[in-house]
Amino acid sequence: LPGFTTDVTEFIDGTIEGLDLRRLLAAHWATRPEAEAIVVVVNGRNALGGSFYVNSPVTGRWEDYTVADVVPWVDAHYRTVRGRDGRLLAGEGMGAFGALHVAMRHPDAFGAVYAVGLEAFDETGLEDLGMATRPALVKAWFIEKERMALWPAADGPARLADFARELYAADSRGFNGLRGSAYAYGAAFAPDPGGGPPYV
């Protein structure tokens, strides 16, 4: 499962430290053909940047999508080892949280789990990132929430998606990316679908 704002294509186009998963696996299988596997990269991105692979009334049912849609589709279209003993769920960053979350909630579907890059999810992770402790970030969030309250209700979801897209386009890894991730995190773990944009 990819991390926050990571596109599935980044696993094969070299964006992630030159990684091309296709070449890596081909080289591995050339020396160990008995270690066959089907690798599926599940898209967990949404309009706010990431779903955290949880079900949310604001951003959708990402846990269900992973377990109830992706797994059966792969089993129906490929020669798989069906059942939990034939499946490993792995993830990085947001995807690491998702892998642990989904695998623990669905032990009947996944027999193994691997997670890397969970820094944001430890006891002080959000503080260490500055998501809740940077005064400028907190101030910007409240100012933006007041502005969003003025949007016509029917335009709310589309305008919020545009707002998030602009944040990430301006600075996906810095301050603006942190602002966007705060909205995505809130929509996943503290959703308020009736509260208007940003729905947290």
Residue ranges of predicted features:
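Non-catalytic cap/lid and distal C-terminal segments of serine-dependent acyl enzymes
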Residues: L1-V200
